[in-house]
């Protein structure tokens, strides 16, 4: 690319409270030639609040693969473009992946501007472990597909983060209760940074019952933070994969060393694996 090639800016916008916009974002909006937005009417109101008037280009889930190349050509011709979503950080459960991929493949500079993200905002206030987490976005709309997805991640020991909508929250919690267990701890963060912001934690079963008590509690933008499945110290619950690994490694190394390696790989206590090996593997 030449020095005249434009820059694609990935710009985060507020998730509710308009005061959360960054100074750098406002300066970027002021200097770009075009703003690619998920919903041009919604974003028009947002930028109007800050006194910014710029041409818009509609880029959403239904047209991105078809239209991204148009923006790439504009960038090649020297236009600077800002990509925004309706709220929060673009590409996080929002359009933009295909555009960014095409820009990088074309050698166009992509500059991310950090800012609000509902998932991270909710996680940091949840009181659930935040050192390791797995963002899953929106679960499938149909119960069967939703349960299948939950079953695939039911054994995950990392914190799980989901987005959910008003009209599906109760059904989703019902399926979570069936697959993950009614006692799994969960935090619901609703309407983050807005007037009716609510952050509440309980077991999945109790949280669903709490929502049923007042229909207003099911309204708004929602983030679910689910505690990962705890590692068990019970020898009988050592996974088949861990047992197989222990068997294979113990053929080449002393059992104590094999137990230490498998413990590191699968998150079990070394002594639990060692005792299991003594009982089941040693001849």
UniProtKB/Swiss-Prot annotation:
Xref: CDD domains: RsmI
Reaction catalysed by this enzyme: cytidine(1402) in 16S rRNA + S-adenosyl-L-methionine = 2'-O-methylcytidine(1402) in 16S rRNA + S-adenosyl-L-homocysteine + H(+)
Main location: cytoplasm
Group of enzyme by EC: transferase
Pfam families the record matches: RsmI_C (PF23016), TP_methylase (PF00590)
Signal peptide range in chain numbering: none
Keywords of the record: Cytoplasm, Methyltransferase, rRNA processing, S-adenosyl-L-methionine, Transferase
Known EC number: 2.1.1.198
Subcellular location(s) per record: Cytoplasm
Gene3D superfamilies: Cobalt-precorrin-4 Transmethylase, Domain 1, Methyltransferase, Cobalt-precorrin-4 Transmethylase, Domain 2
GO molecular function: rRNA (cytosine-2'-O-)-methyltransferase activity
UniProt cross-references to InterPro entries, sorted A to Z: 4pyrrol_Mease, 4pyrrol_Methylase_sf, 4pyrrole_Mease_sub1, 4pyrrole_Mease_sub2, rRNA_ssu_MeTfrase_I, RsmI_HTH, SAM_MeTrfase_RsmI_CS
UniProt keyword RNA-binding, yes or no: no
GO annotations of cellular component type: cytoplasm
Family: Belongs to the methyltransferase superfamily. RsmI family.
Entry-linked HAMAP family: 16SrRNA_methyltr_I
Role description: Catalyzes the 2'-O-methylation of the ribose of cytidine 1402 (C1402) in 16S rRNA.
Name used for this protein in its record: Ribosomal RNA small subunit methyltransferase I
Source species: Haemophilus influenzae (strain ATCC 51907 / DSM 11121 / KW20 / Rd)
